[in-house]
From Swiss-Prot:
Residue intervals of the YDG domain: 149-302
Compartment(s): Nucleus; Chromosome; Chromosome, Centromere
Domain notes from UniProt: Although the SET domain contains the active site of enzymatic activity, both pre-SET and post-SET domains are required for methyltransferase activity.
Domain Pre-SET span(s) in chain numbering: 381-443
Protein name: Histone-lysine N-methyltransferase, H3 lysine-9 specific SUVH4
Family: Belongs to the class V-like SAM-binding methyltransferase superfamily. Histone-lysine methyltransferase family. Suvar3-9 subfamily.
Residues that bind Zn(2+) 2: C383, C397, C425, C429
């Protein structure tokens, strides 16, 4: 495993007692921020944006002071849904034009996941479709215009977890219809073709006359089947819309994208859709179907020279997961946690000639150990909710989170988006252990495996799907003062708790601009001469949990989230890893260690360098 001094990301500007001069400077900055917010909201309104706040808040007559000058108004309060819409608009202002195509796809899907979870939190019907609608309004669809052939950034084997995800990217723009096609609005661009012209089909097994032999497919056209009942054909199909579009593809030798959908119990939507590449429409005809009605048939042939099909791997992924540890190839440890975790974590090693176990010289623990010279603050008062926190207007913990809950009660709790800091309910709160605002405190929910990799040492992967926003684990070890571990050489498992530094953007760290209320009495000094150095760290060198085996990636699928639950001192925040994307089974779990290049120095003061073997398309080739 690559050597690392891990870095956490964390919260917003901390308030503290300060001089009158400093208070005036801060108030001036807050006033300027309020003015900019008002201007931005008004700009969105002037452009008739669908995602701005209500007009009644924007066009109220400005109040005046006694001297006739206009009073400074606070920016209008926004709901969580409105904030999400504003940030969606701001995040799509053209700054990402230079991103690689696959990174654009990843970012687009993350935006959709956020909108989807916001709609779930707002208890809207069909939150997946509402999420797509919000992206359409914000002009956030990655490929809004239909494209023939492969879409940049979406390779053969790419997995979607819902039809709405495909719509959000612009891969297949019909959430229900199996055939996506260009209508007559494209006639100027495709004047040499007859329209409509098909660009994509999704095979979901809804038609009784379909015949799928992988490379060769007999596809049944659209229309005439019972959508709500047994899916059987109930009337004749017509040669129109998608059916006519496939006919034109056959006549003009235009390939179509083929995506197969399958039931999958471990997927959070119970479905998974795999892109299987481009197919040529070789032939079409009309015939009487199984139910006696006329259906249109299309023979599709997969184009040569494409990567191998992966749908079967997805469809039968459960078959690759052993039912007992005795079936695991290369097993070196049945459970590295020794029964401490709710789900056992096996370890496998098929790399070394003499396989070794990751537990050698390592003690597994489930909770943090605190060094004697580290003083943990007293527990905060907490909220007065009962059972589960549901009313964000009354819950004290929700108020700390900016007036809304950071989690949505879906799939046992999912974080809507990354924040500077998340305030969870703690030991003195009135709610119970099932409260959604205790999501990261719950037991291990996924079947994981520690495995030996060829270049990166030990690594971690999941045997099942992990939905975006799900907590995977907390980084566990011994909490020490950073100054006490600086003399320990070759310790690769030090995680600096630099939430305070990140929230102030110190040392090149990137802030997360979130609406949180960091308490004034956290005891943190912002004027320290050594403010770039975190005061505390987590040492998992010889004692810790499986999080120590999670590797770095320049394009990670996890992110670091600082969480406060038992107290409100961000210097000692809990470090929790959450899923940034919907993660497929057997995919390695990774996060960004956060090193800046040339930031690590040896005992001689010289810059140390370490190669990165993450394998990402945009790997920067060096860890530090």
């Amino acid at each position: 495993m690559a050597g690392k001094r891990k870095r956490a990301n964390a919260p917003d500007q901390t308030e503290r007692r300060s001089s009158v001069r400093v208070q005036k400077v801060r108030q001036k900055a807050l006033d300027e921020k309020a003015r900019l917010v008002q201007e931005r909201v008004k700009l969105l309104s002037d452009r008739k944006s669908e995602i701005c706040v209500d007009d009644t808040e924007l066009h109220e007559k400005e109040e005046e002071n006694v001297d006739g000058s206009p009073k400074r108004r606070s920016p209008p309060k926004l709901t969580a849904m409105q904030k999400g819409k504003q940030k969606l608009s701001v995040s799509l202002n053209g700054k990402d034009v230079n991103l690689e195509p696959h990174l654009k796809v990843t970012k687009c899907l993350r935006l959709f996941n956020k909108q989807y979870l916001l709609c779930v939190q707002a208890k809207l019907s069909r939150p997946d479709l509402k999420g797509v609608t919000e992206m359409i309004k914000a002009k956030a669809i990655l490929y809004p215009r239909k494209i023939i052939g492969d879409l940049p950034g979406i390779d053969v084997g790419h997995r979607f977890f819902s039809r709405a995800e495909m719509c959000a990217v612009g891969f297949h723009n019909h959430w229900l219809n199996g055939i996506d096609y260009m209508s007559m609005e494209y006639e100027k661009e495709y004047s040499n073709y007859k329209l409509p012209l098909a660009v994509s089909i999704v095979m979901s097994g809804q038609y009784e006359d379909d015949l799928d032999n992988a490379d060769t497919v007999t596809y049944t056209g659209q229309g005439g089947h019972n959508l709500t009942g047994n899916k059987r054909q109930i009337k004749d199909q017509l040669l129109e819309r998608g059916n006519l579009a496939l006919k034109h593809c056959c006549e003009y030798n235009v390939p179509v994208r083929v995506t197969r959908g399958h039931n999958c119990k471990s997927s959070y939507t119970k479905r998974v859709y795999t892109y299987d590449g481009l197919y040529k429409v070789e032939k079409f005809w009309a015939q009487k179907g199984v139910s006696g009605f006329t259906v249109y048939k299309y023979r599709l042939k997969r184009l040569e020279g494409q990567p191998e099909l992966t749908t079967d791997q997805v469809n039968f992924v459960a078959g690759r997961i052993p039912t007992s540890t005795s079936e695991i190839e290369g097993l070196v440890c049945e459970d590295i946690s020794g029964g401490l975790e709710f789900k056992g974590i096996p370890a496998t090693n098929r790399v070394d000639d003499s396989p070794v176990s990751p537990t050698s010289g390592f003690t597994y623990i489930k909770s943090l150990i605190i060094e004697p010279n580290v003083i943990i603050p007293k527990s905060s008062t907490g909220c007065n909710c009962r059972g589960s926190c549901t009313d964000s207007k009354k819950c004290a913990c929700a108020k700390l989170n900016g007036g809304n809950f950071p989690y949505v009660d879906l799939n046992d709790g999912r974080l809507i988006e990354s924040r500077d800091v998340v305030f969870e309910c703690g030991p003195h709160c009135g709610c119970g252990p099932k409260c959604v605002n205790r999501t990261s405190q719950k037991r291990l929910r996924f079947n994981l495996e520690v495995f030996r990799s060829a270049k990166k040492g030990w690594a971690v992967r999941s045997w099942e799907y992990i939905p975006a926003g799900s907590p995977v684990c907390e980084y566990i070890g011994v909490v020490r003062r950073t100054a006490d571990v600086d003399t320990i050489s070759d310790n690769e498992y030090i995680f600096e708790i630099d939430c305070q530094q990140t929230m102030q953007g110190l040392g090149g760290r990137q802030r997360r601009l979130r609406d949180v209320a960091v308490p004034m009495n956290n005891g943190v000094s912002q004027s320290s001469e050594d403010e770039n150095a975190p005061e505390f760290c987590i040492d998992a060198g010889s004692t810790g949990n499986f999080a120590r085996f999670i590797n770095h990636s320049c394009e990670p699928n996890l992110f670091v989230q600082c969480v406060l639950s038992s107290h409100q001192d961000i210097r000692l925040a809990r470090v929790v890893l959450f899923a940034a994307d919907n993660i497929s089974p057997m995919q390695e779990l990774t996060y960004d260690y956060g090193y800046a290049l040339d930031s690590v120095h040896g005992p001689d003061g010289k810059v140390k360098q370490l190669a990165c073997y993450c394998g990402a398309l945009n790997c920067r080739k060096r860890l530090y």
